[in-house]
Structure formats: structure tokens, C-alpha cells
Swiss-Prot record:
Region spans: Disordered: 100-134, 148-278
Purpose: Nematode cuticles are composed largely of collagen-like proteins. The cuticle functions both as an exoskeleton and as a barrier to protect the worm from its environment.
Gene Ontology MF annotations: structural constituent of cuticle
Region feature Triple-helical region, mapped onto this chain: 102-127, 153-274
Protein name per Swiss-Prot or TrEMBL: Cuticle collagen 144
Highest taxon listed in the record's lineage: Eukaryota
Amino acid sequence: MEKILVTISTGAASFAVLAVLFTIPSLYNTINEVHDEVLDGVSVFRVETDSAWTEMMDIQITVTPPTKPRVNPFNSIFRQKRQTFSGLPAWCQCEPTKPTCPPGPPGPPGQPGQPGTPGAPGPKGEDNTSTYAPITCAPVSQDCVKCPQGPAGPEGPAGPAGPAGPDGQPGAPGNAGNPGSDGQPGAPGDDGQPGAPGQDGQPGAPGQDGQRGSGAPGAPGAPGNAGPAGPAGQDGAPGQDGQPGPAGPAGQDGAPGNAGSDGQPGAPGGPGLPGNDAAYCACPPRSAVFVSRH
């Protein structure tokens, strides 16, 4: 029985070793194929992202010209802290871009935490040694509860009108009134008829001769009406040229001209250094040097 178990175990172990020997080369080839596919995909992704970034930079340069980078005015006063990146390869010795964006809004409150561990039990309380007088309750009354008088209610509506009273006694006669005031004078009467004409009087005696007057001449009379227009005169000689007037205000600026044509593409850069396995460092952000090349 033991020989049979040893034989079966030996056969199973031999089969497992043979299966591993046949599986390892296939697994190694599969890993190499996956590695090559990943490298090809990363290369294609780099080419596509670089081309997309180049197009975006060309569009941005066409629409808005590049501006000068912002310079901190305190850099010349305060010394910047040095940073060391000795742990990175030689081609990664570059200072990372410092974030200049303002902090974002605070995030939503997190989930409530787990309940804390229960505290240690407190010390045992002291025994009560004081005594109290017995409490005697008043006897419960069986009479009805007398509530206090409530506030006055609202005023009721007005009642109906009562019957008419009897007529009163006649009053005493009044005193005589005062005489009235004089009225306004009346309007004047109409004019009477004209009287009959009287008789002609006797002619008067002839008057004495008058003195010849020697008064000053009267004021000149008003000017007469304008006479007809005379014939047109000959044209006068041309006058001399006047002095030149002051310079007018400057005109408005003209519209901006059309954008210039794109420059010639720069020479391609040299190939980069190969990276170590599992030590690929992140690509630096696009800088002004990259924009100037493209």
C-alpha cells in the first residue's frame, strides 16, 4: 500500500515539473509581447500628444502673441531656497514647476468617524451618611377645584333702536328781528331824447390881421423809398492768400493689420537619452522653450 502511494506521489510531482517546464517559455514569450505592445502604445501616445500640443500652441500663438512670464519683484531681495534632486538621473536634474494657482474651495465634509473607545470606569462613589427628615405630604382635598375668574369677554353688538319718544311742549315766541340794512344803489336810468336845435347866433366881428411867423424850419421828413438797383460793377482783383490755419487734431488709429505668415519650422531636436527600467520620470511641463521651437 505504501509503495502505491509513493508511486502515485512521484508520478504527480514529475507531471507538475514537466508542466512547469513547458509553461515557463510560453509565459515568458507572452510577457515580452505585452511589454512590446505597451511600449508601442506609449510611443504612439507620445507622438499624438506632442502633435496635439504643437497644434494648440500654434493656434494660441496665432490668436494671442506670447507674453512675458511674470517675475516676482521680491526675487532680487530675498534669496530663493535651493532644492536638491540628487536622487534623480542626470537628465531629470530640473526644478519642478511651482504651483501658482490659488487654492480651490474647501471640499464637502467627510463621513462621520467611528465611535471612540469607551472611557475607563470612574471611581466608586462614597456612601451617603446624612439623614433626612421624613417628608409629610398634605392631605389630598376631595372638593372641586376653584378656578380664578377669567378676563372680561368682548363687547357685545349694539342693540336695536328704541321707540320714538312723545312730542315736546311748544316753545316760547321769539323776539322781533332787527331792521334790515340799506340796499345797494340802483343802476343809472336810460339816456333821454336829444333836445331841439337852437337858433343860429349873430355873425361875429372880423378879426385883426395876424403877425407873420419866423419860426425855425421843421425836422427833415422821413427818407423816401429805395430807388431801383443800379447796374452790376466790374469784378474786383483777387485777394491775397490767407495765412495757413492751425494743424487739425490727429486722426484715430487705423485697424490692426493682418497676421504675418508663419515662420520656417525649426530644426528637429536630438534624440533623448534612454530611461532606466521602472525609473521613468514624469515629463516636465511645456515651457517657453518648447513654444519658441514650434
